[in-house]
Amino acid sequence: KVWERCALARKLKELGMDGYRGVSLANWMCLTKWESDYNTDATNYNPSSESTDYGIFQINSRYWCNNGKTPHAVNGCGINCNVLLEDDITKAVQCAKRVVRDPQGVRAWVAWKNHCEGHDVEQYVEGCDL
């Protein structure tokens, strides 16, 4: 499912992401825009680590979910990676919250560092009537 921007912003807010671990809703929206373009079906394979990034948050199979084939996988969220591709993003949000609780925080996401950190991110929630 490709989410419409404001619909996703409302859903993330409803699921408690605005201000979670100090990360504003606008920053989460920027992150999901650049990681997946708001697409829950997005997957990207990383040959160097033989891992795959899944879903709207592009959560990685080396550390956070189990896909049955990533070497030395940890499964920090305790879920099957396919769960991260569901239209219902509740479990993906729970896992993203787990990721951001680590010391790295939101900096775990390369796209956030490259496209959101130090940028004006308000455009990602602009006009959404939140």
Curated annotation (Swiss-Prot):
Q: What InterPro entries does the annotation carry?
A: Glyco_hydro_22, Glyco_hydro_22_CS, Glyco_hydro_22_lys, Lysozyme-like_dom_sf
The EC category is: hydrolase
Any GO MF annotation of the entry: lysozyme activity
| Disulfide bond residue pairs | 6-128, 30-116, 65-81, 77-95
Please list the residue ranges annotated as the C-type lysozyme domain: 1-130
Q: What is this enzyme's EC?
A: 3.2.1.17
User: Is Transit peptide tagged as a keyword?
Assistant: no
Assigned keywords, A-Z: Antimicrobial, Bacteriolytic enzyme, Digestion, Disulfide bond, Glycosidase, Hydrolase
Output one GO BP term: digestion
Task: Provide the leader sequence positions.
Answer: none
Q: Which residues form the active site?
A: 35, 53
Name the catalysed reactions.
Answer: Hydrolysis of (1->4)-beta-linkages between N-acetylmuramic acid and N-acetyl-D-glucosamine residues in a peptidoglycan and between N-acetyl-D-glucosamine residues in chitodextrins
For this protein, the record's SUPFAM superfamilies field holds: Lysozyme-like (SSF53955)
UniProt lists the family membership as follows: Belongs to the glycosyl hydrolase 22 family.
Classification via PANTHER family: LYSOZYME C
* Remaining remarks: Lysozyme C is capable of both hydrolysis and transglycosylation; it also shows a slight esterase activity. It acts rapidly on both peptide-substituted and unsubstituted peptidoglycan, and slowly on chitin oligosaccharides.
Protein role: Lysozymes have primarily a bacteriolytic function; those in tissues and body fluids are associated with the monocyte-macrophage system and enhance the activity of immunoagents.
Q: How does it assemble?
A: Monomer.
The protein, known as: Lysozyme C
Q: Organism, per UniProt?
A: Camelus dromedarius
